[in-house]
Amino acid sequence: MSVLTPLLLRGLTGPARRLPVPRAQIHSKPPREQLGTMDIAIGLTSCFLCFLLPSGWVLSHMENYKKRE
């Protein structure tokens, strides 16, 4: 990298830094029904079963996939 690289990069990104970033006006209401412990447990269990269990199975059987028969 040359000595001029930081100066060139600063010159390219300088105008972008001065642009105003619009803020989102997000307002929400409180939930109609509070989630119970059982609802949360069912949701976390289903996420675990749907996402983590298949990927764990694939990772645990990685050696079987590497073998050529």
From Swiss-Prot:
Transmembrane spans:
37-60
The GO biological-process annotations, alphabetized, read as:
mitochondrial electron transport, cytochrome c to oxygen
Tell where it localizes.
Mitochondrion inner membrane
Q: Provide the alphabetized UniProt keywords.
A: Membrane, Mitochondrion, Mitochondrion inner membrane, Transit peptide, Transmembrane, Transmembrane helix, Ubl conjugation
Which ranges does the record list as Mitochondrial matrix topological domains? 26-36
Residue numbers of motif SIFI-degron?
A: 2-19
Please indicate the ranges of residues that lie on the Mitochondrial intermembrane side. Answer: 61-69
Q: How does it sit in the membrane?
A: Single-pass membrane protein
The protein's matches in InterPro entries, at most eight in alphabetical order, are given as: Cyt_c_oxidase_su8, Cyt_c_oxidase_su8_sf
Describe the PTM: In response to mitochondrial stress, the precursor protein is ubiquitinated by the SIFI complex in the cytoplasm before mitochondrial import, leading to its degradation. Within the SIFI complex, UBR4 initiates ubiquitin chain that are further elongated or branched by KCMF1.
Q: Per its UniProt record, what PANTHER family does this chain match?
A: CYTOCHROME C OXIDASE POLYPEPTIDE VIII, CYTOCHROME C OXIDASE SUBUNIT 8A, MITOCHONDRIAL
- Stated family: Belongs to the cytochrome c oxidase VIII family.
Q: What is this protein called?
A: Cytochrome c oxidase subunit 8A, mitochondrial
